Regions:
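A short mixed-secondary-structure module that forms the rim of ligand-binding clefts
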Residues: 129-165
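Residue-level signal for tight coil/turn positions that link beta-strands
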Residues: 123-125, 132-133, 208, 215
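Short, basic/aromatic recognition patches
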Residues: 87-111
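Short amphipathic alpha-helix with an adjacent loop that forms part of the alpha/beta core around
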Residues: 34-39
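Charged, gly/pro-rich active-site loop segments
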Residues: 42-43, 47-95, 168-239
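A short, Trp-centered hydrophobic/proline-enriched beta-strand micro-motif
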Residues: 103-118, 153-158
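Generic beta-strand structural signal
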Residues: 116, 130-131, 213
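Short, charged N-terminal beta->alpha structural module
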Residues: 1-33
Length: 239
């Protein structure tokens, strides 16, 4: 695991905390307790108190400096640093990773779906089903649709209960939610895959809405992959 050391002045420690949390796999040191031996760290970031605010310097051989103004700019800087400092380790071949993700989804049936708009967020546990390789949810509605209709952006997680680092397993997905027209053939296929006939819908107390989750990024965390020589964290981006 690549660990990044962050050395910070006391006056700008919140900036260091933001960087450390967003980048991940970081160890933070006040400047007066900075280690003398850097051999155990893959990267180093310094956060100094400048006249106009924090000065963030990232890198050892090649250095890049940021002067973030406020939390939003600090988070943006952290994202850029994370992309440079945290490339995927021991990645799986794409086809093997796709198969692993498919198997994980097939072995589960419930996800936590996060939607949001502005400062409003919602996370809902939902049963999912897969039809012709696509991921769907069926629901009677609710506040999750506030975010779906507002911007369509979703994040979803499927995971096992924690029982030790070696058996740790979870899948985080990012993408868009697409509402399926109840009069479409796609809606019919999803309903029938769920074991419901269209005529039965008329007898239900409330309408069932179908939503397709078009996933653009999968992040799989699977401790068992280490035994195959791969990193536990694998990323599959489809865009």
């Amino acid at each position: 695991m690549n660990i990044t050391a962050i050395i910070y002045d006391a006056a700008v420690r919140k900036t260091a905390y933001i960087l450390g949390t967003v980048i991940g796999n970081c160890k933070l040191f006040p400047a007066e307790r900075a280690p003398r031996d850097w051999s155990g760290y893959a990267n180093v970031i310094t956060v100094a108190a400048g006249e106009g605010g924090p000065v963030v310097t990232a890198g050892v051989q090649k250095r890049v400096t940021f002067r973030p103004k406020g939390e939003d700019e600090t988070v943006a800087a952290a994202e850029l640093i994370a992309k440079a400092f945290c490339p995927p380790e021991a990645p799986m071949p794409t086809d093997a990773l796709k198969a692993r993700i498919d198997d994980f989804l097939a072995a589960h049936n419930t996800l936590a779906l996060a939607t949001g708009c502005g400062n409003w967020v919602r996370c809902t546990p939902l049963e999912y089903l897969r039809v012709n390789g696509a991921l769907y949810i069926l629901t009677e509605g609710g506040l999750k649709f506030k975010g779906i209709w507002w911007n369509g952006a979703i994040s979803a997680a499927v995971y096992d209960s924690y029982d030790g680092i070696d058996s740790l397993a979870g899948l985080q997905m990012t993408g868009k939610a697409v509402y399926i027209d109840p009069l479409s053939d796609e809606y019919r296929s999803v309903i029938e895959a769920r074991g419901v006939q269209l005529q039965q819908l008329q007898q239900m107390p409330a309408m069932l809405h179908a939503v397709r989750l078009d996933i653009t990024r999968y992040e799989l965390l699977d401790g068992a992959l280490r035994s195959d020589g791969y990193a536990a964290r694998q990323v599959l981006s489809l865009v």
